[in-house]
């Protein structure tokens, strides 16, 4: 059979849904299957997922996308995985059953413990080794919480039966029938346990947090062989031996999917949150502006590539909030339409700090607020201001990056669900004074994992071959007068100032 009749499958395990995609040799997605899964909020600030539900949801999309594409498992040359990062799963290696729900990246239950570590002057200790700042966002304190607060975890640990990992590790373990306990460098670099210089779990950190190395996965390159998918997972008759050869955290995968392979190239993913990454090459750059130094990817035996990252916790999730909680929007896709019904935002600002604020503020005590309300304020103004809040938060990251890089960023490559909003992209170009390029295929997160998997098996020869396949759908240029931009930004900065530390101030 010709090579062009072979395919890559990508599993994209997100925060609210699992998707599986089939990609052909031209880099085209020929089939997608997607299913949402449940979110659990047991207490204020707590966010959990059921790991078995994630696995079953992911598996069902994997099986249905193969059937949708009308291909056999033997037509699939490799499988790539990309996933929500930082979310931690702990399970029994004999039964394969989780000892507790997965604690999600948005969960802030460990805020006070993080405050305690900061008070103990541990900030530099962690930043130097991991490139991260101390924050409940990362896996380390979530894992420590499970080990200390879940009796079943203590019991299994004492018997040497406990395994832990991020979502990629959990999926690899399930896909290989419990044969492989592994993660890739990009996911490991988000745990706050991994030394990004030595590329290994940091023993001093493990000792300090009392986390045994034995429960942690082996860490591999983002593009290399991990293990084979159990044939029976495709169907009872499946014969294909599909290797898992590409693994990356969702944001690093999007950076690769956008082919930001040169130093200084920047992408922003507009998903549940917003994530801006800039490729810094083979050198980790220490941020002076509270951005994260992180591993972008590692291709086989090649040198590790690093990035600077800024994270916005609530972006597309703010539009979901308008739809599900406030009910002033029935369909998230209509936010552009409603925004167009009003000339401007009437100086209304929405600060969607529902789970605190991410970079460059890193304030887990901030709360969301709407400012500038008048008697004449309509739903449309609030919808418009909510869309704009996504651009304002992203702009805060871009400006911090420019300071760290010592240069102006002139081009932003965008992807993710909310990047389909022309109003948001136009506003982003104007507010940040740069060109915005949206690719014809905004599924760059899933494509990144497909490219990583494909390169490892020679499906694509090299990065150059992949670059030729990428097409730009639309270019947005700044269109708002700079004086007006300055006025808008002044209002935004004032609004943010007023929500900082809110919860602590009122307690």
UniProtKB/Swiss-Prot annotation:
Annotated residues for binding of ADP: 15, 19, 272, 316, 417
User: PROSITE patterns in the record, alphabetically?
Assistant: FGGY_KINASES_1 (PS00933), FGGY_KINASES_2 (PS00445)
One cellular component term (GO) for this entry is: cytosol
Q: Can you cite a GO biological process for this protein?
A: glycerol catabolic process
Tell me what controls its activity.
Inhibited by fructose 1,6-bisphosphate (FBP).
Q: Where does sn-glycerol 3-phosphate bind?
A: 15, 85-86, 137, 250
The protein's matches in SUPFAM superfamilies, at most eight in alphabetical order, are given as: Actin-like ATPase domain
Q: Which InterPro entries match?
A: ATPase_NBD, Carb_kinase_FGGY, Carb_kinase_FGGY_CS, FGGY_C, FGGY_N, Glycerol_kin
First-level EC class: transferase
By its UniProt entry, which CDD domains does this protein fall under? FGGY_EcGK_like
Q: Which reaction does it catalyse?
A: glycerol + ATP = sn-glycerol 3-phosphate + ADP + H(+)
One example GO MF annotation: ATP binding
Locate the residues binding glycerol.
Answer: 85-86, 137, 250-251
Record's keyword terms, sorted: ATP-binding, Glycerol metabolism, Kinase, Nucleotide-binding, Transferase
Q: Give the residues the record marks as binding ATP.
A: 15-17, 272, 316, 320, 417
Family membership, please give it: Belongs to the FGGY kinase family.
**Free-text function comment from the UniProt entry:** Key enzyme in the regulation of glycerol uptake and metabolism. Catalyzes the phosphorylation of glycerol to yield sn-glycerol 3-phosphate.
Q: State the protein's name.
A: Glycerol kinase
Organism name: Mycoplasmopsis pulmonis (strain UAB CTIP) (Mycoplasma pulmonis)
Lineage summary? Bacteria, Bacillati, Mycoplasmatota, Mycoplasmoidales, Metamycoplasmataceae
- Gene encoding this polypeptide? glpK
């Amino acid at each position: 059979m010709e090579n062009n009749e072979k395919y890559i499958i990508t599993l994209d395990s997100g925060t609210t849904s699992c998707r599986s995609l089939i990609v052909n040799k031209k880099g085209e997605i020929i089939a997608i299957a997607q299913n949402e899964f449940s979110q659990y909020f047991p207490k204020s600030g707590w966010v959990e997922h059921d790991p078995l539900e994630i696995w079953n949801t992911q598996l069902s999309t994997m099986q249905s996308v193969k059937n949708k594409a009308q291909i056999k498992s033997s037509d699939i040359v490799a499988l790539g995985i990309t996933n929500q990062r930082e979310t931690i799963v702990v399970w029994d290696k004999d039964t394969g059953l989780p000892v507790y729900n997965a604690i999600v990246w948005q969960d802030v239950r460990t805020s006070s413990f993080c405050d305690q570590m900061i008070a103990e002057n541990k900030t530099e200790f962690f930043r130097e080794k991991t490139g991260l700042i101390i924050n409940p966002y990362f896996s380390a304190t979530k894992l420590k919480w499970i080990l200390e607060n879940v009796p079943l975890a203590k019991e299994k640990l004492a018997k040497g039966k406990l395994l832990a990992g991020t979502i990629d590790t959990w999926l690899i373990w399930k896909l290989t029938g419990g044969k492989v306990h592994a993660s890739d460098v990009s996911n490991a670099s988000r745990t706050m346990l991994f030394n990004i210089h030595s590329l290994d779990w940091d023993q001093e950190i493990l000792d300090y947090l009392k986390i045994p190395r034995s429960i942690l996965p082996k860490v591999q390159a983002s593009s290399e062989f991990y293990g084979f998918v159990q044939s029976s997972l495709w169907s009872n008759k499946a014969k294909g031996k599909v290797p898992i050869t590409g693994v990356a955290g969702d944001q690093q995968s999007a950076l690769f999917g956008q082919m930001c392979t040169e130093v200084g190239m920047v992408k922003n993913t507009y998903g549940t949150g917003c994530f801006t990454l800039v490729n810094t090459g083979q050198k980790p750059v220490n941020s002076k502006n509270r951005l994260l130094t992180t591993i972008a990817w590692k291709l086989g035996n090649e040198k590790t590539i690093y990035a600077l990252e800024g994270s916005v916790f609530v972006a597309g999730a703010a539009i979901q909030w308008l739809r599900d909680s406030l009910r002033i929007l029935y369909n998230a896709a209509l936010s552009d339409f409603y925004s167009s019904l009003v000339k401007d935002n009437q100086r209304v600002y929405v600060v969607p700090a529902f789970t605190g604020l991410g970079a460059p503020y890193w304030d887990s005590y901030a709360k969301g607020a709407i400012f500038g309300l008048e008697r004449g304020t309509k739903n449309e103004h609030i919808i418009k201001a909510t869309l704009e809040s996504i651009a304002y938060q992203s702009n805060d990251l871009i400006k911090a990056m420019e300071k760290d890089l010592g240069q102006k960023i002139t081009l932003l490559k965008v992807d993710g669900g909310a990047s389909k909003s022309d109003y948001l992209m136009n506003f982003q170009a104007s507010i940040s004074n740069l060109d915005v390029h949206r690719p014809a295929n905004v599924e760059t997160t899933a494509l990144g994992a497909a490219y990583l998997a494909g390169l490892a098996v020679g499906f694509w020869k090299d990065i150059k071959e992949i670059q030729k396949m990428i097409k730009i759908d639309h270019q947005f240029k700044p269109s708002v007068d700079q004086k007006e931009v300055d006025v808008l930004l002044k209002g935004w900065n004032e609004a943010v100032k007023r929500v900082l530390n809110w919860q602590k101030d009122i307690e």
